[in-house]
């Protein structure tokens, strides 16, 4: 992954947001922390940044959870979005320029689906519910984003709720664009009948309407590589031409707990709000997540948090000293490591080295501790 853009250009980034039916867990936090680092790195390089993040507030898990809990799905979404944003603020994750819900973008989604119908990239299944599907072969570029073979695509498509064997589909990998209204489900009016959008077209419409085609980074967790990011790109490209949807596709690794991927379906979530309520310093949570490389699948543990708390204490002690060693070299190294695929483990190791020298030997530069604290704040988002 290269986060570089031309020095005078606006840097653009679209990151897939949450489905707001449960609280923010550390897997979410790790993903948005990775893109926060890119955001901060771009700002440090002097770029203007246009960062867009969506909220998937039209999706089956949200409706099912609201029905199970006996609450209105809109109220549930509003509550969980508020908690998510509070958690992100506590972790000092810079907010996106545009924070857009799918429900705010129905007009743009309908326009996109209509264009695909007119062009032949989409078709209607003629059965009891006239759902609209996107033809996976509508763009010759389909498959470039993931690089997966067909068998892998089919497996992941089905695992994510796809319906490869639905009667009437032209192709097994064709993706749902518009789900015709069913009794008891939310729906919106459209020229092709009431219904609601499919998952992938929501992000395509939001990204195209807020940024346009050819954005610098499309990002999210590694579980979104296929089908979500592949189809989001394909939807956008078949409407706007064959120009690629994004210059770079960047994916954060999964966070596990108890030897398993952390997920709502598995029920092994470590919630940011719970850690905060237990007294964990948000900066330590952030440091704990930064201790591993953003692309790596890795496990969270109580020991990892304890180590991060101890590191935070050492860093703060060094930053409060009246003087310290020169910081020019270590700040340059941190910038270099972050520019090299966000190598936070090496950046942290470099900072640990300076802190050790400062605590053991002191220094003669009265400005050094404050300068380093400012750099750590700006580049890593850790408040000393």
Swiss-Prot record:
Binds 1 zinc ion per subunit. Its cofactor is Zn(2+). One of its GO terms (molecular function) is cysteine-glucosaminylinositol ligase activity. A motif ('HIGH' region) lies at residues 18-28. One of its GO terms (cellular component) is cytosol. SUPFAM superfamilies: Nucleotidylyl transferase. Transmembrane segments: none annotated. A motif ('ERGGDP' region) lies at residues 159-164. L-cysteinyl-5'-AMP binds at residues 16-19, 31, 54-56, 199, 221-223, 255. Zn(2+) binds at residues 16, 203, 228. InterPro entries: Cys-tRNA/MSH_ligase, Mycothiol_ligase_MshC, Rossmann-like_a/b/a_fold, tRNA-synt_1_cat_dom. Gene3D superfamilies: Anticodon-binding domain of a subclass of class I aminoacyl-tRNA synthetases, HUPs. Its EC number is 6.3.1.13. It holds the Pfam family tRNA-synt_1e. It catalyses: 1D-myo-inositol 2-amino-2-deoxy-alpha-D-glucopyranoside + L-cysteine + ATP = 1D-myo-inositol 2-(L-cysteinylamino)-2-deoxy-alpha-D-glucopyranoside + AMP + diphosphate + H(+). Keywords: ATP-binding, Ligase, Metal-binding, Nucleotide-binding, Zinc. GO terms for biological process: cysteinyl-tRNA aminoacylation; mycothiol biosynthetic process. A motif ('KMSKS' region) lies at residues 261-265. Belongs to the class-I aminoacyl-tRNA synthetase family. MshC subfamily. Catalyzes the ATP-dependent condensation of GlcN-Ins and L-cysteine to form L-Cys-GlcN-Ins. PANTHER family: CYSTEINE--TRNA LIGASE, CYTOPLASMIC (PTHR10890:SF3), CYSTEINYL-TRNA SYNTHETASE (PTHR10890). Monomer. This is L-cysteine:1D-myo-inositol 2-amino-2-deoxy-alpha-D-glucopyranoside ligase. It comes from Mycobacterium leprae (strain Br4923).
């Amino acid at each position: 992954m290269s986060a570089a853009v031309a020095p005078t250009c606006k840097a653009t980034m679209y990151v897939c947001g949450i489905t707001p039916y449960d609280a923010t867990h550390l897997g979410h936090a790790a993903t948005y922390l990775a893109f926060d680092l890119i955001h901060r790195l771009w700002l440090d390089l002097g770029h203007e940044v246009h960062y867009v993040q969506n909220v998937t507030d039209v999706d089956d898990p949200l409706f099912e959870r609201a029905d199970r809990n006996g609450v209105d799905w809109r109220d549930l979404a509003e509550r969980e979005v508020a908690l998510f944003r509070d958690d992100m603020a506590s972790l000092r994750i810079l907010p996106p320029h545009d924070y857009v819900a799918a429900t705010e973008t129905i007009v743009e989604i309908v326009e996109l689906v209509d264009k695909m119908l007119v062009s032949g990239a989409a078709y209607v299944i003629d059965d009891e519910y006239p759902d609209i599907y996107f033809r996976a072969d509508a763009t010759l570029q389909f498959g470039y984003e993931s690089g997966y073979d067909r068998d892998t695509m089919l497996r992941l498509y089905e695992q994510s709720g796809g319906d490869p064997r639905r009667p009437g589909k032209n192709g097994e990998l064709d993706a749902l664009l518009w789900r015709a209204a069913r009794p008891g489900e939310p729906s919106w009016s459209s020229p092709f009948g009431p219904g609601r959008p499919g998952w992938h077209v929501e992000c395509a419409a939001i990204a195209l309407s807020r940024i346009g085609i050819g954005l610098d980074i499309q990002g999210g967790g590694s579980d979104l590589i296929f089908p979500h990011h592949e189809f989001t790109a394909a939807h956008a490209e078949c409407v706007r031409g064959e120009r690629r949807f994004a210059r770079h596709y960047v994916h954060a690794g999964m966070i596990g707990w108890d030897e398993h991927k952390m997920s709502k379906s598995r029920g092994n979530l470590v919630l940011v709000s719970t850690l905060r309520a237990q007294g964990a310093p948000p900066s330590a949570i952030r440091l704990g997540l930064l201790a591993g490389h953003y692309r790596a699948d890795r496990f969270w543990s109580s020991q990892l948090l304890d180590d991060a708390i101890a590191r935070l204490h050492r860093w703060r002690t060094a930053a409060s000293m009246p003087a310290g060693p020169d910081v020019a070299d270590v700040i340059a190294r941190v910038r270099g490591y972050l520019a090299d695929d966000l190598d936070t483990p090496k950046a942290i190791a470099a900072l640990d080295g300076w802190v050790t020298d400062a605590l053991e030997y002191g220094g003669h530069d009265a400005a050094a501790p404050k300068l380093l604290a400012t750099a750590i704040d700006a580049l890593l988002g850790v408040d000393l």
